[in-house]
Swiss-Prot record:
Name of the gene: argG
Residues holding L-aspartate: T120, N124, D125
GO biological process: argininosuccinate metabolic process; L-arginine biosynthetic process; urea cycle
Species this protein is from: Pseudomonas putida (strain GB-1)
Residue positions binding ATP: A10, Y11, S12, G13, G14, L15, D16, T17, S18, A37, G118
Protein name: Argininosuccinate synthase
Listed EC numbers: 6.3.4.5
């Protein structure tokens, strides 16, 4: 496999990608550049540097991408009120296009002719990484070891690591109970007991949130300030995008918000059960719909809702860098010009309740909407003609004998 001289590897420092690093060196006889992304996963990323150095890697990239992640990926997604299959807030999906982008940037900077990732051949991530890579660098070679090697169990990986002197932490022979992925938007949990769709998840699994039952008995109130569809302040204090999300995770988690247990349809064809912890995102979704409720035109809001499932599917299936997603994003962003104002929320035992919203760009007119005397602002007699015109097609059909009874 002499055609590959240098590979950029998406490297976490864990067992899988450490084995991949050594496997690439031996199988392709190539130089490996490692790239470790800090997306707010809450783990120290610097140990990955020491591991890579110990394995002979000379070019090591460890990048703090938290602000870019929230500003350029999470926030644009939430402008669309994006939810996949009615529940999933796409915490894993939205991180992959940024990682793919950075892999390609590093490949260009280092003269690498290939990239590699640790996604398995059963999951969505292989598709997300590779669609992004090919969109950004059409001629790049992608090496996906899980589709090539025979190391198809954790024990085989451990044995390979020990045989090749790869530093690992072996805790007996017991398999880790969950496969986890974390970033500033969420933590996902898969595998283990969760593979039985009838078995309830364990309370000890959750890392960011208390159970709703153990959340404080006193409600927490917060105010979120929006500018062009993005949160710019919490309780009147301006914050950067990453800090906004981190603070909402902390506040939401303390109130038992953001837990989810679902079975989703993977792009590769199978159903998969996952548990997700997304406290900040859960708050953001509720708040964004609230500020839009007073600032968006009715038909614009309805059109956004119609297009949202397609937009969500594009993100879930790895088409972030596609022309259709970019086209939808331009439309979504155009709709956010007047999405400005403040939303007040009540957080209590797993629930997020909107209790107030205000905006200088509000389309809500109390003089027209009032149940009291409106001083002629709205002529109720006009409704008769409106109703008759909208009933015309149904009246014609009924007169032609098309009875519905």
């Amino acid at each position: 496999m002499a055609d590959v001289k240098k590979v950029v590897l998406a490297y976490s420092g864990g067992l899988d990608t450490s084995v991949i690093l050594k496997w690439l060196q031996d199988t392709y006889n190539c130089e490996v550049v490692t790239f470790t992304a800090d997306l707010g996963q809450g783990e120290e990323v610097e140990p990955a540097r020491a591991k890579a150095q110990a394995m002979g890697v000379k070019e090591i990239y460890i990048d703090d991408l938290r602000e870019e992640f929230v500003r350029d990926f999470v926030f644009p997604m939430f402008r669309a009120n994006t939810v996949y299959e009615g529940e999933y807030l796409l915490g894993t999906s939205i991180a992959r296009p940024l990682i793919a982008k950075r892999l390609i940037e590093i490949a260009n900077a280092t003269g690498a002719d290939a990239i590699s990732h640790g996604a398995t051949g059963k999951g969505n991530d292989q598709v997300r990484f590779e669609l992004g890579a090919y969109a950004l660098k059409p001629g790049v070679k992608v090496i996906a070891p899980w589709r090539e090697w025979d190391l198809l169990s954790r024990e085989k990986l451990m044995d390979y690591a020990e045989k090749h002197g790869i530093p690992i932490e072996r805790h007996g022979k017991k398999k880790s109970p969950y496969s986890m992925d974390a970033n500033l938007l969420h933590i996902s949990y898969e595998g283990g007991v969760l593979e039985d769709t009838w078995t309830e998840h364990e309370e000890e699994m959750w890392r960011w949130s208390v159970s709703p039952e153990n959340a404080p008995d006193q409600a927490t109130y917060i105010e979120l300030t929006y500018r062009n569809g993005d949160i710019v302040a919490i309780n009147g204090v301006e914050k950067s995008p990453a800090t906004v999300l981190a603070d909402l995770n902390r506040i939401g988690g303390a109130n038992g918000i953001g837990r989810l247990d679902i079975v989703e349809n993977r792009y590769v064809g199978m159903k998969s059960r996952g548990c997700y912890e997304t406290p900040g995102g859960t708050i953001m979704l509720k708040a964004h719909r609230a500020i839009e409720s007073i600032t968006l035109d009715r038909e614009v809001a309805h059109l956004k809702d119609e297009l949202m499932p397609k937009y969500a599917s594009l993100i879930y299936t790895g088409y972030w860098w596609s022309p259709e997603r970019l086209m939808l994003q331009q439309m979504i962003d155009a709709s956010q010009v007047n999405v400005n104002g403040v939303v007040r929320l009540k957080l209590y035992k797993g629930n997020v309740t909107v209790v107030g919203r205000k905006s200088d760009d509000s389309l809500f007119d109390a003089n027209i909407a009032t149940f009291e005397e409106d001083g002629g602002a709205y002529n109720q007699a006009d409704a008769a003609g409106f109703i008759k015109l909208n009933a015309l097609r149904m009246r014609i059909a009924a007169n032609k004998g098309r009875s519905l009874l």
